[in-house]
A protein has these predicted regions:
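Basic/polar, cationic surfaces and motifs that engage anionic cell-wall
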Residues: 1-23, 34-38, 116-127, 131-219, ...
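N-terminal catalytic cores of peptidoglycan-degrading enzymes
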Residues: 1-121
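Oligomerization/assembly interface segments of phage tail-like spikes and tubes
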Residues: 46, 126-130, 226, 230
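Short strand-loop junctions, especially beta-strand C-caps/beta-turns
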Residues: 49, 131-133, 249
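Alpha-helix N-cap/helix-initiation motif
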Residues: 65, 137-141, 249
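Acidic, Ser/Thr/Pro/Gly-enriched interdomain connector segments
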Residues: 197-250
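LysM (lysin motif) carbohydrate-binding repeats in extracellular/periplasmic proteins that recognize
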Residues: 238-243, 254-270
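Acidic, glycine-anchored loop motifs typical of Ca2+
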Residues: 248-250, 273-276
Length: 291
């Protein structure tokens, strides 16, 4: 049983473990505390996102979607090992799970089969979503697995927990398969070895890129709201391609698509290659400032 870490303490714990951490938007106040209790905390739960692409995955986990409001976890672990903090407090990640599993986590004993869904896991578990399609084919880079190990160990170290306080979603709720592609027993072994030693200490963050990396074509869809879209729109206006009546703004719109199509035509694209949906080459040439 433990009082949840404050935003500052969580951030410090992760960085002290050697992780590169990005604070995403207003993560410190992004939570579901108005829908239910947060704490006491008992463990860490690992998930996969069933998505690809860092930027779109982070936005999804921050905002959630119509069927499941965000945040969908506390941190998103990217393929390159970067941890993007998206929530602080209760998050929609664990759902209902097995009370026998919770008792085993608290006692730090071997887990029983998860055959019931009768206990609110969002109250008791920190959640990390890891960017992976979850199809058993999408690879888990070494940097990402190391970051999962470090992130889970960081929270455990801050609370004085052992590796048995870390579980996968598939060990909590019947029918879940995540994380798929590595075993939780192997990950717990890694976490246990790490906890036997001292934390790695703060890492030097890589330099922030000058321009926004291409977030993938699927990022540009109806319902998307992101400061990246605003920054893109401002660059389109600067290039003489703005087709806005009002804006640019954060919500992806028909005006954004028409403006981007004008940019594609300016670059010499025609037909379906100038449909207004960004591609990597045209995006890189637009040089959208980092936000």
């Amino acid at each position: 049983m433990a009082t949840p870490l404050s935003a500052d303490k969580l951030l410090k714990a992760l960085r002290d473990e050697g992780l590169h951490v990005v604070e995403h938007r207003s993560w410190r106040t992004n939570n579901r505390n108005h829908k239910g209790p947060w704490g006491p905390t008992h463990g860490v739960m690992i998930h996969h996102t069933v998505t690809s692409g860092t930027a779109s995955s982070v936005e999804l986990c921050y905002n959630g979607h119509s069927a499941l409001p965000g945040p969908l976890c506390h941190g998103v672990i990217a393929k390159d090992g970067t941890v993007h903090l998206v929530g602080n407090g209760r998050a929609n990640h664990a759902g209902l799970g097995d009370d026998d599993v919770l008792r085993a986590v608290i006692a730090e004993k071997a887990l029983p089969p998860d055959n019931e869904a009768n206990t609110d896991g969002n109250r008791y578990f920190y959640g990390f979503e890891c960017v992976n399609l979850g199809d058993g084919k999408d690879p888990w880079p070494a940097a990402q697995l190391l970051a999962i190990e470090r992130a889970a160990a960081a929270v455990c170290r801050a609370h004085g927990w052992g590796e048995r306080s870390v579980i996968g979603h598939l060990e909590w709720q019947p029918g879940k398969v995540d994380p798929r592609g590595f075993t939780m027993n192997s990950m717990r072994t890694r976490i246990g070895k790490r906890l036997d030693g001292s934390p790695d200490g703060p890492s030097q963050p890589p330099p922030k890129p000058t321009y926004e990396p291409f977030p993938g074509s699927s990022f540009f869809a109806v319902g998307r709201s992101s400061p990246v879209v605003t920054a893109m729109g401002k660059r389109l206006v600067a290039e003489g391609c703005g087709r806005y009546t009002v804006g640019p703004g954060p919500a992806w719109s028909t005006a954004d698509r028409n403006s981007y199509a004008a940019w594609q035509r300016k670059l010499g694209y025609t037909g379906t290659d100038a449909d207004g949906i960004p591609g990597k080459t045209s995006w890189d040439r637009l040089k959208v400032p980092n936000v």
